[in-house]
Amino acid sequence: MDTALPWFKDAFPIYLAPMAGVTDKVFRQICKGYGADVLVTEFVSAEGVFRRNERTREYLDFDACERPIGVQLFGADGTHMAEAAKQVVDWVAPDFIDLNFGCPVNKVVAKNGGSALLKDCPTLTSVAKAVVDAVAPLPVTAKIRIGWDADSVNAVRVAEILERCGIAALAVHGRTRAQGYSGEADWRVIGDVAQAVTIPVIGNGDLFSPQEVMRRRAEPKIAGVMIGRAAMSAPWIFRQIKHYLATGELSPAPELSERWDAIIEHCRRHAENWGDEEQAIRAMRARLMAYSKNFPEAKALRKKFQHVATLADVERIAEEHLATAATMSDFVGQAFLPATA
């Protein structure tokens, strides 16, 4: 496949999806450690960059160990988007710029950003072309949904437009904007997009297991996949996927102790980055709720996570949870021991 993005050459890259409030620098690096091939920042307001807003600029921060990494921009003004993209390239030199044409959130759509541009192809075209021209030869990619709603599924047309604009690769989430994250992702439409264009197409939606990724890799012309919500509760899914694609064998989830080590490290680094431990740990509560999924005694854990305010709180909960799990394991083991005379 002829592409300006080298990670597609003779490979099937696994992307970490950009998720607002989730894929900050700390979490991206955790996922990279577990095997994510390509990272993308949380979406960044092009208007904020254009106006040199310092808070916006914080979202652009990444470390060299995260490469290859792209900065994702959203906006609807082609001139401002182009200038913002040039500023981003000058400031942080990402490996690519990514354009958000898929976000379903009301506050983004209300400003004609994100998935709103799926029903405004002239503006989408002007934005894509302006950014591609502004940062050339740096590659520009894009992420879309399959359409605005069930009556306007136009992903193939949008993909063809974006390819003509010079977009180097396209991630397609298999839901409409109206669906949000409900219902099932329509991989038939993702496949239609992949057949319609010559640029790499990355499939996204309902990839919660290595088996599902293997299934999608086998579909014609799908060049890679993007993992989103599954990584929020299990960043080690990247390691499991890589193992399964390489060997055809399923590897178990990490031991409970390793999962807790990852959570505590995430909290510790998040607190260091914020410089205010209590504020940082309180901000981590929603992330801890996601981590608790598929943990033993998950409901009880979630109740405890609602009140954490320090790293010591998290460490205490981990210690108690591991002790309880060990006791239960010993009890189960004793229950199945053979009777003795």
Where does each model-flagged region fall?
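Hydrophobic alpha-helical membrane-association signature
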Residues: D120-V127, A262-I263, M284
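Active-site beta-loop-alpha junctions enriched in small/polar residues
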Residues: M19-G21, V44-A46, F74-A76, G102-P104, ...
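Alpha/beta catalytic cores of nucleotide-metabolism and tRNA/nucleoside-modifying enzymes
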Residues: M1-Y15, A20, K25-V26, P139, ...
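Alpha/beta enzyme core
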Residues: A82-G113, C121-I199
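Glycine-rich, positively charged N-terminal anion/phosphate-binding segment
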Residues: M1-D10, M19-D95
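Conserved beta-strand positions in the central sheet of alpha/beta enzyme cores
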Residues: L39-V40, G70-Q72, D98, T141, ...
